[in-house]
Amino acid sequence: MEPLQKPFGTVLENFLNYLLIERNFSPNTRDSYRNDLQRYLQAMQEGCGSLEAINPDSINRFLDELHKTGLEASSIARNVSAIRSLHRFLINDRVLESNPAENLHQPKLPKYLPSVLTLDETMRILQAPAQKVPPEKLYLRDQAILELLYATGMRVSELVNLKQQNLYLQEQFIRVFGKGSKERLVPVGSSAINSLTLYRQKLRIQLAGAQSEDCLFLNARGKKMSRMAVFTIVKEYAMLAGIPKTVSPHTFRHTFATHLLEGGADLRAVQEMLGHSSIVATQIYTHIDRSFVKEVHRSFHPRG
């Protein structure tokens, strides 16, 4: 892909800086916007020649081309959202006087239910690190990661960015910084606390050595772990536990929410623990186990 020329390149960088500084978006979210908008602005640069020449037809032609590449509906929707946000920014920044993306509609997305682990599958994965033969040096760290993912439902990006000072283990809370640096306190149970304590006392000190790295979870070189490293760990122990389904850190997030709701937890409390800004995002977990919902209705409705 050829580099963007002025003013297209300038507009993109200004918008990305706006997302990072004024909207407080995470670097990962900003990079996602960069990838989508780089492709969009490249097409507009080649097809329109100027920002002022962009019109609804040129945007729709671009989206049609995305459809032809076989891009999933969710990815198309993400592109539409990015394009709309960019053009609103250009209006507010007085770069353009009219908004060609004003009437751009999001494509309808197929509803899906997230994959979750049964309680038995969850326990098998959580027990897998200690059952490795021979046991590996890093199993205490891996055990703590798995326990924490299930205990808190936090996102993988939140986990790798945890600092030592974010732990309040005596109070059984962890301070988590989510999307847009939104802060929340998440309860953590005794099993995860025990695993975290063992990791910090017996392994983390060795991994850190003389380095001053403050991130909670470190790799074998004493540096902050990457998101992909956590994905690899989760996948490895799921395979070791004989789980046939695809398991990722986000599977633990889905499982955390589902098991809480199946246990009778309040939907608003689960929303707060997950860090969802809208209750709608949390409600999907009420649809996962239809038999459970029916049982709740039978148990609590006066005429159930």
Language-model regions, residue ranges each:
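Conserved catalytic core of the tyrosine transesterase superfamily
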Residues: 1-304
